[in-house]
Amino acid sequence: MLLNSKRGQVSIEMLILILAVLLSGTIFAAHMTKNTVSHDEISDVKKQTFKSFLGSVEGSTASSLPEKISEEDTSPEEDTIPEEDTSPEEDTIPEEDTIPEEDTSTEIPIGKNVKIYNLPIKEEKQNWFLDILNTALDRISAILDGFFSLFGLDLFNNDEIIPNILVKDFEGNRIPLSFDWERLSYTTDWFYAKEIEFTGDSSAKYSKLDLFRIFPIYSYSDTTFRITDLSYNLTYDVPPSTAKKTITITSNIPEGIKCKVTYKIGGILTGDYYTLEIDEKTSSNKYNNVNIAFE
């Protein structure tokens, strides 16, 4: 009996011990699992915070770098652009503005290379001629007047015709100038012109030709090319009110060409030529030239 009771007690104690061991194992296992889970969570949190920190650091550095680059790029552009743009503008603008302002002469400038001259007609009973005086170019022509004009002939030697000459009559109509022009009588082929306009420029080409010549005996020392007789007799062909008006000469022909206005008093054979007084200063040789030079 005693033996049986002892065996039963030992079995009960062994059972209790086994249960205690199992219980402690489960408790230990449960505790270990709790520690591992918390450790994993902590590591995940650390990883996420580290990644976010790295992202913030990269974002801050990326945002700061383009600002520095843009500042370094724009600073030299802002320095070079106004220097290159403003320097030529400041040099060219005053030069273009001061050129027309300096023209303070008696002539009336209507353009950069164009001037207008008003030639007053003071008297009525006179013959008015407009001549181009050769100064710098080669010999333009030689005109014979006086005795040979009685036969209705003039001499033209080595004529160099100047193109782009517009002659207008008193009604504003254009009068064409013929290159093979010859005067067959004293009263024909002369134009009653009110305005003579030169439209050539500095690079104008001159057509040179020899016209029909008769009696090549005499020529003036001052070679001229007579464009037009403004009036053979103003009192006969032009009303006195019109004859008293001014003659406008607009010119932009090359430098070296000048003009003069002469009138004749007397008959065909004995008449003398005089220069129209454009201003008070007249030269001793009776040539009061009006400069219509290209500038």
Swiss-Prot record:
The record's GO CC annotations read: cell surface; extracellular region
Q: What induces it?
A: Expressed under standard laboratory conditions at 35 degrees Celsius.
Q: Which Pfam family is one of those matched by this entry? A: Class_IIIsignal
Q: Which UniProt keywords apply?
A: Fimbrium, Secreted
First-listed, main subcellular location of the protein, grouped into a coarse class: secreted
Q: Where is the composition biased (Acidic residues)?
A: 70-105
User: What changes when the gene is disrupted?
Assistant: Disruption of the gene does not change the piliation compared with the parent cells.
Q: Which domain of life is it from?
A: Archaea
Motif QXSXEXXXL: which ranges?
A: 9-17
The entry's protein name is: Probable minor pilin MMP0601
Lineage at the top is:
Archaea, Methanobacteriati, Methanobacteriota, Methanomada group, Methanococci
